[in-house]
């Protein structure tokens, strides 16, 4: 991470749980153990503030040190790797993305999605900070209960975040995106659970697309088997050595034990992490955040519905879960 605040939101709690399990094992008591401050000196998050919303900067003790207010609900927040700016992207159906100074919270500018589209909550800077990529969703026809096609908008930061190129996301309803190794990984969530589009639906149409990070060409795609078609692939995390995972949410609320964490292979193939059935059921079909620890050896999933954080070794061995009320 560069200077200033690193990207985390409430993922800090995931790392605290990961450290706890790594130190004490799956049966360790859920006690606060202290969390080392990130290399950048703090965290970034989005939150409800009074009657509105804000992007906020937190120090190593999670005290708020910068607040950028917004009338629109925000979701993912991403710091520039080369300066003090950060961008918080509106939650679907997002109308704005907020550019702000993460050192003092001062709003710098706002920008809108492309014509006929909405933001879906996430964007990423390129490594040199020159471009900002946003996942956007085309608005479906009026009255249609469907999720629109996905577009990755490539934006020129110095030019005021104007769109310079548009790529297909490789699917419908993209949510998260992330550069990992030599690919730009896009989680096309398809139909999002707990939305009007999801009513009576049994399959999301979700998948993973691996794009060329320079041209946007789709190199590979990954789909779930038919028995997991109700899952929406939503959030990504990488281990720093080219390994990437994706976490899911389930359309169905039938109590079945479906895996919600998958490893993404270089050809896009998806392999489920292992866990006992009761562990999957304990997440209640919903993972709101996924993150690796700084070493890349642990990966954790937070479920606000299950009120817990589940942790695995990155190799796939399930370690256990710790309670965390409404942790996401």
Which residues are covered by each model-predicted region?
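N-terminal secretory signal peptides and thylakoid transit peptides that target proteins
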Residues: 1-20
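Surface loop/turn motifs at the tips and blade-to-blade linkers of beta-strand repeat domains
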Residues: 67-71, 112-115, 166-170, 223-228, ...
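Blade-loop segments of beta-propeller domains
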Residues: 68-79, 83-99, 105-125
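Repeated scaffold domains used in trafficking and secretory/extracellular systems
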Residues: 72-79, 118-124, 172-178, 230-235, ...
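Residue-level detector of Asp-centered blade-edge/turn motifs that repeat once per structural unit
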Residues: 81-82, 127-128, 179-181, 239-241, ...
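Asp-box/WD-like beta-propeller blade repeats and closely related beta-sheet repeat scaffolds
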Residues: 114-124, 134-178
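Short, conserved, GDST-rich strand-edge loop motifs in beta-rich repeat architectures
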Residues: 135-147, 186-204, 247-258
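Beta-propeller blade signature
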Residues: 149-157, 203-213, 259-267
């Amino acid at each position: 991470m560069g200077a200033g605040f690193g990207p985390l939101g409430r993922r800090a709690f995931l790392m605290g749980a990961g450290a706890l399990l790594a130190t004490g094992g799956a049966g360790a008591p859920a006690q606060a153990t202290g969390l080392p401050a990130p290399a950048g000196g703090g965290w970034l998050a989005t939150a409800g503030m009074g009657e509105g919303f804000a992007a906020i900067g937190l120090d190593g003790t999670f005290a708020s040190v910068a607040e950028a207010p917004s009338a629109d609900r925000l979701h993912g927040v991403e710091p520039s790797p080369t300066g003090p700016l950060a961008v918080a992207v509106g939650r679907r159906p997002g109308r704005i993305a907020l550019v702000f100074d993460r050192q003092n919270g001062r709003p710098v500018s706002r920008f809108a999605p492309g014509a006929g589209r909405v933001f879906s909550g996430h964007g990423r800077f390129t490594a040199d900070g020159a471009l900002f990529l946003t996942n956007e969703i085309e608005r479906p026809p009026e009255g249609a209960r469907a999720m629109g096609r996905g577009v990755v908008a490539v934006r020129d930061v110095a030019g005021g975040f104007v769109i310079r190129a548009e790529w297909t996301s490789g699917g419908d309803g993209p949510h998260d995106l992330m550069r990992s190794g030599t690919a730009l990984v896009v989680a096309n969530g398809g139909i999002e659970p707990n939305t009007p589009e999801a009513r009576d639906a049994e399959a999301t149409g979700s998948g993973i697309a691996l794009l060329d990070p320079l041209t946007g060409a789709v190199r590979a795609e990954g789909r779930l088997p038919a028995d997991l078609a109700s899952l929406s692939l939503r959030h990504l995390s990488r281990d720093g050595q080219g390994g990437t995972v994706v976490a899911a949410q389930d359309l169905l609320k039938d109590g079945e034990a479906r895996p919600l964490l998958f490893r993404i292979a270089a050809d896009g193939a998806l392999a489920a992490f292992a866990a006992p059935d009761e562990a999957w059921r304990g997440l209640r079909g919903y993972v709101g955040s996924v993150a690796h620890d700084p070493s890349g050896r642990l990966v954790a999933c937070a479920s606000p519905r299950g009120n817990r954080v589940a942790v695995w070794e990155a190799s796939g061995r399930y370690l256990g879960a710790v309670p965390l009320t409404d942790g996401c």
